Amino acid sequence: SLETGRYLIHNGNNIVSRNLAEDRSLNPKRIVLLEPTDKIQLTWIIEKSGDEYILNNRGAPTAHIEDHVFALLIHQEGATKWSIEAVPRHGRNAYIIKGSDGKGWVAPDKAGEQIIYRTLIVGPSEPPTFPLNQVFQIIKLE
């Protein structure tokens, strides 16, 4: 299991984070897939809470609102407690991220689009396999 700390979250070569440019409102901010760039390190603070995790991006905890993932600037008590499950068959640091209803994070088809929250597809193998758009690399920063 992951310990509380600073992490990067990727899907394949793309970075998962809030947009660098956002409106100034207090509305929930979209969590999106971004092109890889070495100019920025978009750090997540992952807080372990029992068997679940609060995922904070740029100071704001995340939640699913309907079928997408957002960062909450206000009403942060509404943050989702996520379960993060290792999927070692997909490599080191490979995980799926799920809510309590069994749905989970799914990367969109292209960079710039928002992380989707929906029922996960599980391959009928032992151990199970997952489509790569459901597998996220969570890398601890020292």
Swiss-Prot record:
The keyword Transmembrane does not apply. Inactive at pH 2.0, activity is restored after 10 minutes incubation at pH 8.0. It holds the Pfam family Inhibitor_I66. InterPro entries: Inhibitor_I66. The modification N-acetylserine is found at residue 1. Serine protease inhibitor. Active against beta-trypsin and alpha-chymotrypsin with dissociation constants of 0.35 nM and 40 nM respectively. Inhibits factor XIa, but not other enzymes involved in coagulation and fibrinolysis. Does not inhibit subtilisin, lysyl endopeptidase, arginyl endopeptidase or papain. This is Serine protease inhibitor.
